[in-house]
């Protein structure tokens, strides 16, 4: 058993409470490798932001659970080395699908886990979430539950439809499970292809495809039922057009990739939404930089020469999200 506190990590409880009061959201950036982690930590330190290092089940398998634990510990030390005396870094399991997966993560040093039972019948979701909460809280690990289904594909998470969260269920769910935060569905979607062209329309001013608006009325109803309770948005990448254009310019084939407009995420961040998940944007930034380097320097074969620019491009993206979308800059306790 490895306790996350021995790794220098924190859970989400205090940072979420501060975020709700302060009207901002904590960035939850998914990562799969060292370059992504370095970029996340550098961006968080330079903007003085708390941050959630988010790992899917697939990413944990890819990185190896033991190596991942030391990477998280290293992230804390790296932040201190960069000048942050008291970093606030969470290691969070994204979309845990079984009790066993969540337990394994808790036992290996995760400070927060998500149990996603949203695909199950309601009572089964309640029972599974409560089982994870009961175990996690013994070790002061925070738990995120989910109500409602997001469409899209990302790692092992896949659904061809979305179901908005039913506000009438949230009080019962939060009370019976004891979860610390709740992921809801209000129209966000996983992956880079969040909406079909048929679901979107062209903005005459910019000529860009615009997705349907988020269902803020559902969010408002949830906030009314659970005042002050931490809410989470998944599938919140904006799919930056410049990154998509770079990928396509240098041999990619990303057609009709549409994300969530940043102005909608800004609006959500000022509400009880205190955690916003971003994964696809990082993948796009990394891929765009690598493709550009390969095209401009076809003789290059030193991984540092293409992963370095990718890391820099991701850091730029993370800083932008913190400063201009989420508002979590300068929010560290000390």
Question: What residue ranges belong to the model's regions?
Answer:
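Extended, intrinsically disordered, low-complexity segments
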Residues: 289-334
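Generic N-terminal amphipathic, Lys/Arg-enriched alpha-helix
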Residues: 1-27, 300-301
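Shared catalytic-loop signature of beta/alpha-barrel
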Residues: 53, 60-64, 265, 274-298, ...
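Alpha/beta enzyme core
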Residues: 10-21, 34-59, 66-86, 95-230, ...
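Short acidic/histidine-rich active-site segments
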Residues: 235-238, 258, 278-282
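Short catalytic-loop micro-motif centered on adjacent basic/acidic residues
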Residues: 26-30, 91-92, 114, 231-233, ...
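A short N-terminal beta->alpha junction/helix N-cap motif
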Residues: 3, 24-32, 59-60, 305, ...
């Amino acid at each position: 058993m490895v306790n996350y506190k021995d790794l220098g990590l924190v859970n989400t409880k205090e940072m979420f409470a501060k975020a709700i009061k302060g009207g901002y959201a904590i960035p939850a950036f998914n990562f799969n490798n060292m370059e992504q982690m370095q970029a996340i930590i550098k961006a968080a330190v330079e903007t003085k932001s708390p941050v959630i290092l988010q790992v899917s089940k697939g990413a944990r398998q890819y990185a190896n659970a033991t190596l991942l634990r030391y990477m998280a510990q290293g992230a804390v030390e790296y932040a201190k080395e960069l000048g942050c005396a008291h970093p606030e870094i969470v290691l969070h399991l994204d979309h845990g699908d079984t009790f066993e997966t969540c337990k394994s993560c808790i036992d290996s040093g995760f400070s927060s886990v998500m149990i996603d039972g949203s695909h199950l019948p309601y009572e089964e979701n309640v029972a599974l979430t409560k089982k994870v909460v009961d175990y996690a809280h013994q070790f002061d690990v925070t738990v995120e539950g989910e109500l409602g289904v997001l469409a899209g594909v990302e790692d092992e998470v896949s659904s061809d439809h979305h179901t908005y969260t039913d506000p009438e269920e949230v009080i019962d769910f939060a009370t019976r499970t004891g979860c610390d935060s709740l992921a809801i569905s209000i129209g966000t979607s996983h992956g880079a292809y969040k909406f079909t062209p048929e679901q979107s329309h062209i903005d005459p001013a910019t000529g860009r495809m615009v997705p349907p608006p988020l269902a803020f009325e559902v969010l408002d109803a949830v906030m009314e039922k659970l005042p002050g309770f931490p809410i989470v948005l998944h599938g919140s990448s904006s799919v930056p057009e410049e990154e998509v254009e770079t990928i396509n310019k240098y041999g990619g084939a990303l057609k009709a990739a549409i994300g969530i407009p940043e102005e909608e995420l800004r609006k959500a961040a000022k509400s009880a939404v205190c955690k916003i998940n971003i994964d696809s944007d990082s993948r796009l930034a990394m891929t765009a930089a690598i493709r550009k380097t390969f095209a401009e320097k076809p003789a290059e074969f030193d991984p540092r020469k293409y992963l370095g620019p990718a890391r820099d491009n991701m850091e730029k993206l993370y800083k932008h999200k913190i400063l201009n979308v989420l508002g979590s800059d300068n929010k560290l306790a000390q």
